Amino acid sequence: VTALDYDDLATEYAKHRRPYPGLVEHIVERAGVTSDSTVLEVGCGTANHLAAVRRTTGARCIGVEPSAEMRKQAAEHPEELDLREGFAEELDFPEGTFDLVMSVDMIHYVREPLRYFQRAFAALKPGGHFLTVTDSDWAIRNRIPMARYFPATIEVEFARYQPVPALAGDLALAGFTDLYERMIESTYLLHEATKFEDKSHSCLHLIGDEEFAAGIAALRADLAKGPIEANQRSLALWGRRPL
């Protein structure tokens, strides 16, 4: 798989990415986040979800992200965020710091998920919640418009994403209990191809130029006939540090 430079992608992420519909509400409700909570997002990128949690609850929000350009874009949010350089497997916070540790569309970049989960477990308060938002095989196969117009992304994503049962197994090995899965789903009307033309999804950088060009041409042709019903699905995988 071709390596991606997320410093180069930061501008497009900031331009096109928004919090997933329904996800922040689910996070706040499931984890019971309040203004008294301390929340960590690992691999926060441009921090859209972290900023939304802060905006919704007033919680203290810390984001860890290795890309300097991603952190620069994240700092543009009006919400007060504590942004730090770092990697998932190298989390080094005092024991029992956080009420919630979360990551969104990040776990497939982590080479040693168990090590990350162990570090996150230690950083959580007893009773604290852990969340990783990822994609299931089914969701990857049924992404619209992605899988329809850029089918080469399916195998690319299968090569990147860990199977959800394997992640759940590692969470259990790390000590987490109360494991829980929830698919967050929404549909919307896609009116233009801009975010796909700009390759604001990392998987589009990992397919061939001819496959990309053919997909864009087909997408534009269908959009010329009217908007396309698209979907957004994310699998929320939860665990909890026992009391």
Where are these regions (language model features)?
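Class I SAM-dependent methyltransferase SAM/SAH-binding core
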Residues: 40, 46-90
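Short alpha-helix
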Residues: 159-174
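A conserved beta-strand element that flanks and buttresses the S-adenosyl-L-methionine
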Residues: 102
